[in-house]
Every structure is written in C-alpha cells, then in structure tokens.
Amino acid sequence: MNSIALGFLVINKPAGLTSHDCVNRLRRIYGIKRIGHGGTLDPAVTGVLPIAIGKATRLLSFLPSPKTYEGTIKLGISTNTDDLTGETISEHSWDQVKENSILNCLNKFQGEIKQCPPIFSSVHINGERAYKKARRGEFFELPPKLIKIYRIKLINWNKKDGTIDLEVHCSPGTYIRSLARDIGKKLGCGGALAKLNRTMALGFNIDQAIELPDLDKNNDLNKPMIIDPLKALSHLPSIKLMTIDELSSWRKGKHLILSKSRLKNPLYLIEDDKDIPKTFLTVINNENHLIGLARWHHEPFKIEPKIVFNADG
C-alpha cells in the first residue's frame, strides 16, 4: 500500500493532454486511484493544474478559487470554437484597431459581467455536454453566466500580426475563449483565442509547477514531492487539539467547546473569493499534522467537525 496519505502536486500541464490524461498518469506512477485535479484545462491549454493526492481530494473545494491566465487573442477571425482550433466562420480586417481602443475595450470587461460559454464546451444541456451537440451540427444557444474579472491587463499589442497578449485574473467558470470572442466583437473585427497558459489556480502558481513525470521512469526518484495540505490551506485559521479527550471527541465527530484564544491566524480574509465559507478552519494535532476541517461558531466558541482525518496523524 502506498505510504502517501494526502497532499497536493502542481503540474505544468503540457499541450496535447487532457487534465484527465495527467491524472491517469499520476495514478499509475503513485499506484493510487484516489487522485483528482482542481480545474479542467482544454488539451491545447498549458500551465498550472493542481492535483490532489489521496484524501486531499476532499479539500479541493476549500482552496482559493480565482484563477490567472496569460493568453493571446488573434483579431480578424471568428471560429465555431472561439479559438484557432475551430472552423473559420468569418474574417475581417483589424486595420482600424488602435491600442487606445483595446485599452478602453478591456476596461469594459472588468468587474462582474455576463458571459456566454462557447458552444464547444462541457456545459450540460438536458444532461448532455454542449460539445457533443455542437459536433452533430445542432443549433443551440447557451444562456449567459455571471462571472467576475478581477483584473484584465494588456501585455502587448502587435498591430502587424493583429494579436493581443493579455493577463486575466478571474472567477471560476470564466471562459477565456469567450472573452477572446467578445473582445473581438467589441473591436469590430472578430477574435479567437490563439494561445493560453494558466499561471495560477487554487492558490498555486506557475513557480510551484513541475513537469509531468515520465511513465517510463516509474521509480521512487521519479515521484515528485507532495505539498503539505496545511500549506495549501494556510489562508484558513487553525486550531490545535492537544488532549486525548479532545482527539477522541474529534474522531467521533462531536462538537468541541474551546477557547478562542487558541486560534492561530484568527483574523483572515480571502479577498474577492465568495466561494469559500469564512467559517471554516483547519484542525491539527500535537505533531502539527492536519486531522481535518471544522466549521466554527461564536458564543460559545465551538468547532463542528466537517472533514475528519486520522486524529493520530
């Protein structure tokens, strides 16, 4: 049995593989079935793919949800997939586009906006993925979804090639392909996503990312170091259970009334992230091992077990 209990990896996903391909390879390398990823990337997209190992799959929803991308938009072309892998629908000149008009356009997309997902996407329609209906040539429209663009920044404008390089910091559920399409429409010439790299997801950034291990070198030296889940959850407050009675009650899923003064990092905020409830904390034992997550309540201060791991560490 593999000795890994729980933790995270950050993979720098290469182009050409699905997120599930990466998970399958890691399952074979580690000999563990319980491995999941935190946020699907299209095969052509590269960059940060957070991987949860073992019981850490239960922690994914407690990680910070905003994501950051660096992408390139090709102006003058519209496709059925909203990127350059699709069939061309129309082509137009971008000669009239100037840098100031791009900056003004990008400003209109900052904040909360409604966005229609691409028809070639994994959105469900009556129990079926949208891309399956699109492949059959069916005509349909997807309803707009409310998303949030926290930051959108112009990195470079190449007038000759008609390409816009930009950085986007956004809420989950944002389609950068749709953003490329809509920016092209507002600029009056159409646009499609040419390239995309995710540089941050679930609190992990590209500097932490490693290359996907090679299956042909399946040995202990080839297994990347697992990131301690407490590091991934450092945005949450923490409390330590110190007595046998406290640990016993925790194992049994009982509420514990404790002193609030035992809280570590009690004043915390997750900026612009409404997806993580502000009432959760990590629970550790005397060896500083994560033994679960709890919901905390005021007056009296008590913790209610939400996720319980082995209290022995």
Swiss-Prot record:
Record's keyword annotation contains Transmembrane: no
Alphabetical UniProt keywords: Isomerase, tRNA processing
Protein name listed in UniProt: tRNA pseudouridine synthase B
Coiled-coil ranges (or none): none
Catalysed reactions listed for this entry: uridine(55) in tRNA = pseudouridine(55) in tRNA
EC class (word): isomerase
Pfam families: TruB_C_2, TruB_N
UniProt similarity note: Belongs to the pseudouridine synthase TruB family. Type 1 subfamily.
Gene name tied to this protein: truB
EC number, as in UniProt: 5.4.99.25
Molecular-function GO terms, alphabetical: RNA binding; tRNA pseudouridine(55) synthase activity
Keyword Ligase: no
Lineage: Bacteria, Bacillati, Cyanobacteriota, Cyanophyceae, Synechococcales
Active site residues per record: 42 (nucleophile)
Task of the protein: Responsible for synthesis of pseudouridine from uracil-55 in the psi GC loop of transfer RNAs.
BP GO annotations: mRNA pseudouridine synthesis; tRNA pseudouridine synthesis
